[in-house]
Amino acid sequence: MKSLLKWLLKIGLIALAFYLVFKKVSWESIKETLQQFSLWWLIPAFILYNLSQFLSAYRLLHMFRSVGVNIPYVRNLQLYYKSMFYGLFLPGGVSGDAYKVIYLQKRSEASYKTLITATLLDRVNGLTTLLSIAALLLIQRLDVLQEYVPVKAWWIIILLIIGWLVYFLLHRKLFPAFNGVLFKITAFSWVIQCLQLLSFFCLLKGFAIVAEQWISYGILFYGGSVMSALPLSINGLGIREWVLVTGSGLMMIDSAKAFSASFLFTLISGVCALIGGIIQIRSQVAGREVANNSQ
């Protein structure tokens, strides 16, 4: 009952987000914008997004191996895509991360606490990097921020340096088991976020948006990514779109194109999650065949 309530709340939030979006931008303008999209740009966008997932799985593998979970990369990659599928469709506590933890705990000597810690630290590292890139992009559009706060570019840079120093010190003190891979996974996180940003830029190119505006779209894209990382909806659906459309006025960009690019990115991530579902079905079928042959 509790899981059903959470599921219904997420659906309600998605509906609210889209309601607010369509109050700001008409469906006709979105439809017209999508019709103008060059479909060829979906190919590099899809490839770049999947490359980011391959590297994300490799980053997480380093965290697991730090606590003695020696799983082959290919199996971990399959597990990563399966968890994307479960995270997309299963409500409540049965999330993608929970699936990874349960799966590995049954096949290793690591405790639930250790595996949960590794998974959460992996996410925190990625989120910290995401916020850092968003801040660096924001420096390019300080004119927008300075309308509300008299901020300087060097203030943001200093805050980033201090923030990363604090992050590294706390991480090394509180989670010494992962000290050996801390800098490596951080480097992975920067590459992963850049790959996802490039994937989004491919979608912008498909809408023939001039490169001079990509930074503005990118800032809102990262803002939406931060919001969609929260367990508020299904795969961030509606949340990222709401952020881009709401912020489009501040950034002086086309709200219909902002929504459409964000929606296509969400669609790509959803398709990748479905790939995880196919992998899961194939593994279940193979498992049944092995069981039948052994009888």
List the predicted regions and their residue ranges:
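Hydrophobic alpha-helical transmembrane segments of multi-pass membrane transport proteins
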Residues: 73-107, 114, 228-233
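Predominantly cytoplasmic-facing regulatory/coupling regions of multi-pass membrane proteins
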Residues: 1-81, 130, 136-232, 239, ...
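A cross-family signal for key residues in well-ordered alpha-helices
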Residues: 102-105, 201, 245-246
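Hydrophobic alpha-helical segments and helix pairs
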Residues: 103-143
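Hydrophobic transmembrane-helix microenvironments that flank and shape a buried ionizable site
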Residues: 7, 94, 119-123, 193, ...
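Juxtamembrane helix-boundary/capping and inter-helix hinge elements in multi-pass membrane proteins
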Residues: 67-72, 104-115, 249-256
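Helix-loop junctions and terminal segments of transmembrane helices
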Residues: 61-64, 97-102, 241-242
